[in-house]
From Swiss-Prot:
GO terms for cellular component: cytoplasm. This is Leucine--tRNA ligase. Its main location: cytoplasm. The gene is leuS. It catalyses: tRNA(Leu) + L-leucine + ATP = L-leucyl-tRNA(Leu) + AMP + diphosphate. Belongs to the class-I aminoacyl-tRNA synthetase family.
Length: 831
């Protein structure tokens, strides 16, 4: 490593770069990696996300684009409050220190960010604008307040996010968490359900997996609502939603959610029964919270192991037969899906069948299968209707259409689509977030803060040792005057969900002025390439799509889809290590034990995680191997979308390869006074083909294949000796996006006063790529002998025969032939 002083090279190259320049005459390209939470430390997993974006940004600049490549900080959130509690440090100070540290780390790896656009979501200059958005949403009817069920810690007297509930207890107090309804703010994302669903069709640059996950999350169901009258209650109905209205004659019961209005109106449950069902029913507010898995499956789709129902005192009447059916309150019916009520047809629904079996309810088959399938439940939408009165003899789809027309004509129902997507609850009972800009006045009720009085900022002096929300208990902050009457009022002490900040930051980057500047957004939006983990496929990406539509509706921007293309990079994985007691070890701890001769169990390669201690510290890697080696290796082995296995051997190999490039270029520089070497036609064709392939792979973001082409070019130049200013420039130009420091440094040695960053990409001759010849390397025992040009349609035997002439009389023991690449003769006699 002695002759590759990467620290000196990094310092030199970074002093040359200016990433803030813009040329609005050029076509724009906006590349954005999801901005980080300032936790204080970057690991290798972060590196992959940001380097992918940087490679694309550098490549697009070299193609002449006006590239927007910004960075910022998703700076609000719970960890800062935890730090305040555990370490007695103010969240703002903790966050600012972490940002400073991470900013230094990001700059050290040569990321070409326009730092003049840097933003932090915890800055009042940033969140002032989202307070304005909220007021606009309120005026447009997109924001509202209602009671909603939450996790309540009775000791700390505060609302807990799901991740703060551990085994049913509060993370801080250890108290048993209870469900409680409190007023919460919501955004009407459900109003955009169909639009969000249809919009996915236009996102041809998104992975199909992500679009499928969002489709499932939105959860469109086509069906009908049908009214069942309540026996003994004149003019009272239960509206039932069903996706299978044709099975109405197989109904043997109805069921409603524990949160259905009738439960309270008709006093259907005792307190004990209500609590039993609440415990057995997945908390409906969990459907949209911070820590969901990202399978795209909602709680509404989950099938409970136990179908629990409590039989009520009332019955409902079948809308056609008039038969009385029992009414249950059941744990598998959700208030905010459909109508919060269902009819059960056990013969043709798996869930209903399980419920009927448990409660001994009738099971009447109303579809006769064409096949010999007589087992119940029969859930296919195929067959002929039977036991169904006027529907008998119809095919299932025909009967469905007929029954919908029937219920519509007699006024007991209609066709209806239902969506699982629920409104977004944006209230959080936390200090470290954006204050909600409303006040409450006894005389005037809820009133929005005047725009000229924004931003509503957080108080600096807060006490985190008291129970509950620090804003709620602040002695002065929450007391203010009503914007309408001027009388005493109280501020809303909730803050926005942190997804609020990340739902529009991409638009804020378009202008250095801050906020959303419509003309700047017209220039840069939508984002051309958005890069981040697939764990954000549902919540963040769906919220951002909704938020863009809401901003469009309120006149802020003209687009409705924020991200034209999406790349979900794979996880970075690493071996796990355990000591003899089974405790996980950090890699450096495992190395230390091995050096002492102690036993270390090496486990499988898994996603890097703090819990398994298989994380690799980015600063240590950069300090030991340099930024370029880390960048180069992280993109080498697998496509960006696939998982990547980190290894010491791999990073060391990348370091040595870059050192080899440096030596190769310096060899040329030291010999160029002897005169330029003329590059032969065969080598020119080979280089031309490499440039062509490299360009194709960069356009397709097959970055691992592009890295392979860099290796191929280095091998070609080394073997052929075709070192010239022209060929070295080609090498450095295609190397620059991946290893920018070394490429820039060597380019400065190749030609004075030339900056490689932003210089044009190397061109290739299309005619030469169409050549009917191919050039192969001929090797003997792995060592380069000569290049051999052969016709593309030559057989393997012909190629080996021609190549063999180049090794003269050597005794060949084995031939290794790689089509289109190489012939290697393994010889026992030198010949």
């Amino acid at each position: 490593m002695s002759n590759y002083d990467f620290k000196k090279i990094e310092q030199f190259s970074q002093s040359l770069w200016d990433f803030s320049s813009c040329d609005f005459q050029r076509k724009k390209y906006y590349v954005l990696s999801m901005f980080p939470y300032p936790s204080g430390k970057l690991h290798i997993g972060h590196l992959r996300n940001y380097v992918i974006g940087d490679v694309l940004a550098r490549y697009k600049r070299s193609q002449g684009y006006n590239v927007l490549h910004p960075i910022g900080w998703d700076a609000f959130g719970l960890p800062a409050e935890k730090a305040a509690i555990n370490s007695n440090i103010h969240p703002r100070i903790w966050t600012e220190k972490n940002i400073a540290k991470m900013r230094t780390s990001l700059k050290s790896i040569g990321l070409s960010y326009d730092w003049s656009r840097e933003l932090s979501t915890c800055s009042p200059k940033y969140y002032e604008h989202e307070q304005k958005f909220f007021l606009a949403f309120l005026k447009a009817g997109l924001a509202y307040r209602k009671n909603s069920e939450v996790n309540w810690d009775p000791i700390d007297k505060t609302v807990l996010a799901n991740e703060q509930v551990i085994d049913g207890r509060g993370w801080r107090s250890g108290a048993v968490v209870v469900k409680r309804k409190i007023p919460q703010w919501f955004l009407k994302i459900s109003d955009f359900s169909e639009e969000l669903l249809k919009g996915l069709e236009s996102l041809t640059g998104w992975p199909e997996k992500v679009k499928t996950m969002q489709t499932n999350w939105i959860g469109k169901s086509e069906g009908a609502v049908i009214k069942f009258s309540i026996s003994g209650y004149e003019e009272r109905f239960i509206e039932v939603f069903t996706t299978r209205p044709e099975t109405i004659f197989g109904a043997s019961f109805c069921a409603i959610s524990v949160n259905h209005p009738l439960v309270n109106e008709l006093n259907l449950l005792s307190n004990a029964e209500r609590e039993i069902l609440r415990i057995q029913t997945t908390c409906e507010s969990d459907h949209y919270d911070d820590n969901k898995n990202f399978s795209g499956t909602t709680n509404l789709e989950k099938v409970h192991e136990q179908k629990l129902g409590i039989l009520t005192k009332i019955k409902v009447k079948h809308p056609f037969s008039g038969d009385e059916l029992p009414l249950y309150v059941a744990n598998f019916v959700f208030a905010e899906y459909g109508s919060g009520a269902i009819f059960g047809c056990p013969a043709h629904d798996t869930r209903d069948f399980a419920f009927a079996q448990q409660y001994n309810l009738p099971c009447l088959r109303v579809i006769s299968a064409k096949c010999t399938n007589t087992a119940l439940p029969y859930c296919l939408e195929e067959g002929v209707m039977c036991n169904s009165n006027f529907l008998d003899g119809m095919q299932v789809i025909e009967a469905r259409k007929f029954i919908i027309e029937k219920i519509s004509s007699i006024g007991i129902g209609e066709a209806k689509n239902s969506y699982r997507l629920r409104d977004w609850g944006i209230s959080r009972q936390r200090y470290w977030g954006c204050p909600i800009p409303v006040v409450y006045c006894e005389k005037c009720s809820m009133q929005p803060v005047k725009v000229e009085d924004l931003p509503v900022t957080l108080p600096e002096e807060v006490e985190f040792t008291v129970q509950g929300n620090p804003l709620e208990h602040h002695p002065t902050w929450k007391y203010t005057n009503c914007p309408k009457c001027g009388g005493p009022a109280v501020r809303d002490t909730d803050t926005f969900d942190t997804f609020f900040e990340s739902s529009w930051y991409f638009a804020a980057f378009c202008s250095k002025e801050g906020g959303i500047v419509k003309e700047s957004c017209k220039r840069f939006l939508p984002v051309d390439m958005y890069i981040g983990g697939i764990e954000h496929a549902i919540l963040h990406l769906l919220y951002a799509r909704f938020f863009t539509r809401a901003l469009n509706k309120c006149g802020y921007i003209d687009i409705v889809e924020p991200f034209r293309n999406l790349l979900t990079q794979g996880m970075v994985c690493h071996e796990t290590y355990q000591n003899s007691s089974g405790e996980y070890l950090y890699p450096e701890e495992a190395k230390s034990l091995l050096e002492k001769g102690e036993k270390v169990l090496v486990g499988k390669i898994e996603k890097m995680s703090k819990s398994k201690k298989n994380v690799v510290d980015l600063e240590e890697i950069v300090s030991k191997y340099g930024a370029d080696a880390a960048r180069f290796f992280i993109l080498s082995d697998n496509p960006p979308e696939n998982s990547f296995g980190w290894s010491d051997r791999g990073i060391n190999a990348s370091f040595k390869f870059l050192q080899r490039i440096k030596n190769l270029v310096e060899r040329y520089l030291s010999s160029k006074n002897s005169g330029e070497v003329q590059t032969g036609q065969n080598v020119k064709i080979q280089i031309n083909k490499i440039i062509c392939d490299m360009t194709k792979y960069m356009d397709e973001i097959k970055l691992n294949c592009a890295v392979a082409k860099i290796h191929e070019l280095v091998n070609l130049l080394s073997a052929s000796g075709a070192l010239s200013k022209e060929t070295i420039h080609v090498l450095l130009r295609i190397l620059e996006p991946f290893a920018p420091h070394l490429a820039e440094y060597l380019a400065s040695k190749l030609e004075n006063n030339v900056i490689l960053y932003g210089s044009p990409w190397v061109a290739y001759n299309e005619v030469l790529t169409q050549s009917d010849a191919v050039t192969l390397m001929v090797r003997k025992n792995g060592k380069f002998v000569q290049l051999l040009e052969v016709k593309k349609d030559s057989s393997e035997e012909e190629i080996i025969s021609q190549a063999k002439r180049l090794i003269k009389n050597a005794v060949v023991d084995k031939v290794i032939y790689v089509p289109g690449k190489m012939v290697n003769f393994l010889c026992s006699s030198p010949g």
